[in-house]
From Swiss-Prot:
Transports viral genome to neighboring plant cells directly through plasmosdesmata, without any budding. The movement protein allows efficient cell to cell propagation, by bypassing the host cell wall barrier. Keywords: Host membrane, Host-virus interaction, Membrane, Phosphoprotein, RNA-binding, Transport, Viral movement protein. Interacts with host protein HFI22. This is Movement protein. One of its GO terms (biological process) is transport of virus in host, cell to cell. The keyword RNA-binding applies. Pfam families: TBSV_P22. Its main location: host cell. It comes from the Viruses. One of its GO terms (molecular function) is RNA binding.
Amino acid sequence: MDTEYEQVNKPWNELYKETTLGNKLMVNVGMEDQEVPLLPSNFLTKVRVGLSGGYITMRRIRIKIIPLVSRKAGVSGKLYLRDISDTKGRKLHCTESLDLGREIRLTMQHLDFSVSTRSDVPIVFGFEELVSPFLEGRELFSISVKWQFGLSKNCYSLPQSKWKVMYQEDALKVLKPSKKKASKTGSSV
């Protein structure tokens, strides 16, 4: 799999305006290519790709991620691509450690993976192996951003037909309540 990625320095407000731009996925359905956008889940956007043929392959994925945390926090992590059709979550791809305080642009020319049109085989992108220089804040920055590809259990078209639905999910890991210390130090990031 050929992968290119870069990190960009821009003010956060400029990056926020671009949050819906640049995230695209080229899907090969049978003999045809279809380009679909990837949008954050809060846009409540789902893209329908008509099912035809036995398998769907994914190519030319372009993902732009705006900063997830403050640049001053110094949080870094690796972007993983996993097949989560089983409990092992087989790794399909992994980047080098990236600064989560900057914009990340990721381009993948081809995924060595096909999704059957008759089964539910989700593929997930997410940040793992997060590292923070602030020991107490490591769990605080356990933020995952996932792009999940899978079959929908519902019909989204009239007349009724089967559709492949692709959606992006933003998920915050639930922080476990920690034991309160007798004395707290007022440090913030």
